[in-house]
């Protein structure tokens, strides 16, 4: 008896359905070829995040007001040591100090926030909580995230989202524009 939990990822709902059906057919074929039985159960699924330009621009404006993350001397030493362990980093220490230009893309990652975004206008923010160049799901991400570097990033994210929420509350134009775009 073998159990596997996983799921196909694709940039859109129809793509996930098609890919899922192919995975099922491949598993059925493998079961026939090995004279075994294949059964499956869909336990959950996540829709891709539906981007909302109105909210993304609002959040980006609030992030630009607050700026990036500066390291203390101690944090910089830690970051440099951690940076030495990274494989093919795509950015350098210091990049966390500036806010990157807003690029509107559709995330292909799996998240329950994607499900929410199909019910209400949704957006979020990505903040440097790791040493620049760190790969997600790595020990380096965990190591940096548990330090003041991670705390600074989390705090900045909270401030950006809170300031954005206040702006939404007091300026109904953003709310109506986000809803119009979503519909």
Locate the predicted segments by residue.
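Long, hydrophobic, amphipathic alpha-helical segments used as structural scaffolds
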Residues: 34, 169-172
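Short glycine/serine- and small hydrophobic-enriched flexible loop segments
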Residues: 162-167
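Secondary-structure boundary/capping signal
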Residues: 35-38, 124, 183
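Zn-dependent metallopeptidase/amidohydrolase metal-coordination segment
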Residues: 76-158, 176
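Midchain, well-structured core segments that form catalytic/ion-binding scaffolds
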Residues: 1-71, 81-83
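Short, compositionally biased segments
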Residues: 8-9, 171-173
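Divalent metal-coordination and catalytic microenvironments
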Residues: 59, 116, 161
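Single conserved hydrophobic/aromatic residue that forms the stacking wall/gate
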Residues: 174-183
């Amino acid at each position: 008896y073998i159990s596997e939990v996983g799921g196909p990822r694709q940039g859109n709902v129809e793509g996930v359905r098609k890919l899922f059906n192919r995975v099922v057919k491949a598993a059925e074929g493998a079961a026939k070829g090995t004279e075994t039985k294949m059964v499956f159960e869909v336990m959950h699924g996540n829709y891709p995040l539906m981007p909302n330009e109105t909210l993304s621009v609002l959040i980006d404006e609030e992030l630009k007001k607050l700026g990036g993350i500066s390291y203390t001397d101690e944090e910089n030493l830690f970051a440099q040591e951690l940076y030495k362990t990274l494989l093919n980093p795509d950015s350098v220490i210091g990049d966390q100090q500036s806010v990157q230009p807003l690029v509107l893309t559709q995330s292909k990652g799996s998240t329950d926030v994607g499900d929410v975004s199909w019910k209400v206008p949704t957006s979020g923010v990505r903040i440097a909580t790791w040493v620049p160049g760190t790969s997600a799901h790595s020990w380096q991400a965990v190591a940096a995230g548990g330090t003041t570097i991670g705390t600074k990033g989390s705090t900045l994210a909270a401030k950006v989202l809170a300031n954005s929420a206040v702006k939404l509350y007091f300026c109904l134009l953003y709310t109506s524009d986000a809803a119009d775009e979503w519909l």
